[in-house]
C-alpha cells in the first residue's frame, strides 16, 4: 500500500475504533483544499463513507480520479458565486463529473458569497448529513 493509502486507513480506523462507528456512519467534509482531499479519499476508499460535504473546492485531476473510484458516496458541494480563489465554474465541472460517473450529487451555489462558508451553506450541509445518516 502507498503511504497515502496507509494514512487514510489509519485515520479512518482510529475514528471507527474510538467512537465505535462503521465507515458507513462517518461523513467527511472539507473546505477548499480540504474539499479536494475529502472527495479524493471518499471516492477511493475501500469502504463507503456515509457522505461527503465539500465547500469551495474542485476535483484535482478528473481523469486520475475516475480511474480510481471505488465508492459511490453521496456528495454535497457548496460554492460561493463570487469566489476569487477557487472559481465557481469548478462546481459545475464537478457536478458534470459526478453525474457521468453515476455518483449522487447535490449542489448549492450561494449568491454574493466569496471564499468562505456562510450560514446558508452550513445549514444545507447539516441537513444533507442528517438525511444521509437517517437513510443508512
Task: Name each model feature, range by range.
Residues 23, 70-75, 101-104:
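Short, proline-enriched alpha-helix->beta-strand connector loops that line the catalytic pocket
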